[in-house]
Amino acid sequence: MKGQKSYRIKKNDTVMVVTGKDKGKSGKVLRVIYKKDRAIVEKLNMIKRHMKPSQQNRQGGILEKESPIHISNLMLICAKCTDPTRVGYKVLDDNKKVRFCKKCNEVID
């Protein structure tokens, strides 16, 4: 059995949408869904759901919530150069594998 997939985008990263209805908008990643290759980004790709009243949602009605976006449609925004960038990996001197911005070579984490 294979282990968990590794993505260049992780929870709490700031990302920009490259394609789709929210193209050009940016937000913070709330969750990465590894099995479906998707991520949920804060206040992006909003959908409306009609909910019946229930124990958790007493009032019911129309709720707006974030819908998952495919990982390939997102680009990480570098904190230093503030541009959407491709992400690379490199191993530091202390044998720690880190992500880095391919535009400015700044270490991301």
UniProtKB/Swiss-Prot annotation:
SMART domains in alphabetical order: KOW (SM00739)
Complex and partners: Part of the 50S ribosomal subunit.
Record key words, sorted: Ribonucleoprotein, Ribosomal protein, RNA-binding, rRNA-binding
Pfam families: KOW, ribosomal_L24
Lineage of producing organism: Bacteria, Pseudomonadati, Thermodesulfobacteriota, Syntrophobacteria, Syntrophobacterales
PANTHER family: MITOCHONDRIAL RIBOSOMAL PROTEIN L24
Gene assigned in the entry: rplX
Protein name as annotated: Large ribosomal subunit protein uL24
Domain of life: Bacteria
Gene3D superfamilies, per the entry: 2.30.30.30
Entry-linked NCBIfam families: rplX_bact
PROSITE patterns xref list: RIBOSOMAL_L24 (PS01108)
GO cellular component annotations of the record: ribonucleoprotein complex; ribosome
Function recorded in the entry: One of two assembly initiator proteins, it binds directly to the 5'-end of the 23S rRNA, where it nucleates assembly of the 50S subunit.
